[in-house]
Amino acid sequence: MTEPSSGLTYAVDIEAADASVKRIQDHVRSTYNENVLSSGETSFGGCFAFDAKEFTNPVLVSGTDGVGTKSEIASIMGKYDTIGIDLVAANVDDIAAQGARPLFFLDYISVGKLDPEMMEQLVSGIAVACAEAGAALVGGEMSEHPELIEPGHFDLSGTATGVVERDRILPQRLSAGDVIIGFDSPGIRANGYTLVRDTFLKKAKRDLNGPAWAGADVTLGEELIRPSVLYSPVMQSIFATDADVHACAHITGGGLAGNIVRVLNSELDATISRGTWSIPEIFNEIQREGNIADSEMEKVFNLGIGYVCIVPEDSVSTVEEVCAEHNRTAFRIGEITNGTGRAVLQ
């Protein structure tokens, strides 16, 4: 009778799993603060305590998201250390749009074959972004699916939980005359990658090691894997000022109009003025290479505005100053008007 391998259970490599856990421990612990009582690293669940006495009527806000098929670009390039930043940004920036400050984060990593080095790179990016956002990485799951996912490939998702005072949940008090301020996004972030891959890799057969566009000082691969900006830290700084924030929108799939419309009521419109911000060259290259209509580009991509903050006129300068302190550029891109609940670009 053949002696079974001690390292495999139903084709899942237990030894690789153990090695992965050891390699990620320091990264995970680097996100801990005094509120972490126990973590999923050694317990069945992560325990997190926060001082409710800081709040009058605290409300927990949770959001779950992934990185979509940007993971395929990371796999092709064999570069896994930054896409975890995209994951955290996708989640903490979502809950910041409700006014929430992130407390803790959970991740889920599914791979075709457990590779301890790859796992460490993935988690290192998550940990870096969690630390920047002020969220403790209190647990997660590593799952091996050899029959569903090819070796070297992965799927990545996560959940952020934060807290906000009940009377500060956004949106609120939105009114005609409010100013729409857009925060710059130097890259694509983590949405639209099915169209990106179809354009560059399937149709144009572009080399990821070639220039991103004519005269670019970065390769196409480097530009496509560029990590997302975290806007939650910017918003937390704005929330700490006397700026009167009426609404926020995280600009992901659906573009500016498709996301801003989510904060409107049936009596208000959002009018966004094209040409009021700088569009990064990568979007022009996508459109040229794929012969994509303007309307499609506006539906799929952020086109250089990754986040929107809507405030009354007397709060605009405060928002601009805080953005500058965080090395972000704030553009005045539109306004709220009386209407029927539409968001339009003109």
Question: Where in the sequence are the language-model features?
Answer:
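Glycine-rich phosphate/pyrophosphate-binding loop regions near the starts of catalytic domains
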Residues: 33-186
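Glycine-/charge-enriched secondary-structure boundary and capping motifs
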Residues: 2-11, 26, 118-136, 149-154, ...
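Charge-biased, low-complexity intrinsically disordered regions
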Residues: 5, 10, 14-18, 112
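Intrinsically disordered, low-complexity, positively charged segments
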Residues: 15-45
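Glycine-rich beta-alpha junction loops
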Residues: 66, 162-165, 178, 185-189, ...
